[in-house]
Amino acid sequence: MDLLNVVYIINFILLLLAAITDIKERIIPHKYTIAMIIINLVVGYYYFGFNAIIAFFSTLILCLILSIGMGGGDVKLFTALAPIFAYPNSFVFYIPKYILYLIAISMFIAAVFPMYKILMRYWKDIIPSACYLTMMLGILYYFINIYEIPYASIIIWAYIVLSIFVSRKVPKYKEYTKKLGYLFPAYLLFLYIIDTTYFIKYNVLLTSIIYLCEIILISIVIYALTGVETSDKKHIEELKEGDILRDVIIIDKDGVEVKNLNIMKRIKFLLEHEIKENEKEIILTDGEGLSNEDIRKIKKLYMEGKIPDKLNVIKTYPFVPFVVIGYVIVLMLMKLAII
């Protein structure tokens, strides 16, 4: 086993230790990142020469950009790993392609996991309603193919998105779509009986399953946008650096207001705040979460009796475990010469 493979194993161990700490304490100790940087720069330079230095600094710049919407400690791990992936002819805009794969895979897994949690929590609503919408989609497409109606697909998909939004706001409509969704198998059987040629020619069963999966995915995204992030009430005294508030705290001369806003409402609020050039001070967290200064302000407001003793904090998931999984996948794909 050569030195580079030994270093890959050492990095895996360090990432694993960082992941365990991230799960337990939601922090990434600097000692792991610093150890990786020192080891990887030395070994990377030994194997790849100046390419390792280029890889390090170009990835650092990329990670500084990424850290605007993510935790800085998380993305620094990509920078630390860059020198040992600086293979010749593997650079894309001065960044090793293996690091880009690692970032993409890690972020993909990190995005899929909370979506899976939403599906597990709301599957009794999402799946029957998605079956109803797939059935409606199939029926409408049947007539579109017969009469060749132009631009109908755009209208149909707009209806699907609108229907999901409405079902989130109107409980009776949601129950209506859920009940009709149970007719989905009967719809497939009925279509097969009345027009077997069409059913086979357009492979209706397979396309229906694909459409069903697409609509379920759209539903999960809309559920997330309309406020099903998992959140917990947290006492002011228990707030920590990095916590992401679901609440927005608005401070002006007339008093303090705490608003519990979902993603869509937060975006709308920020746009209105910027357009109106509002001079009100706001405490609103991004991917970095609360800073120590934010926590001091919140505690001061609490001591003055201006805000409640508990705030809504979005439940987040440690990112480093996803990096570990991505790291293993990238190494396996490299060794198998797939990437």
Curated annotation (Swiss-Prot):
Its EC number is 3.4.-.-. It comes from the Archaea. The keyword rRNA processing does not apply. Disulfide bonds: none annotated. InterPro entries: Pept_A24A_C_arc, Prepilin_IV_endopep_pep. This is Prepilin peptidase EppA. It is a multi-pass membrane protein. The chain crosses the membrane at residues 3-23, 27-47, 48-68, 75-95, 99-119, 125-145, 146-166, 180-200, 204-224, 319-339. Belongs to the peptidase A24 family. It comes from Methanocaldococcus jannaschii (strain ATCC 43067 / DSM 2661 / JAL-1 / JCM 10045 / NBRC 100440). Keywords: Cell membrane, Hydrolase, Membrane, Protease, Transmembrane, Transmembrane helix. GO terms for cellular component: plasma membrane. It is an enzyme of class 3 (hydrolase). One of its GO terms (molecular function) is aspartic-type endopeptidase activity. It holds the Pfam family Peptidase_A24. It is found in: Cell membrane.
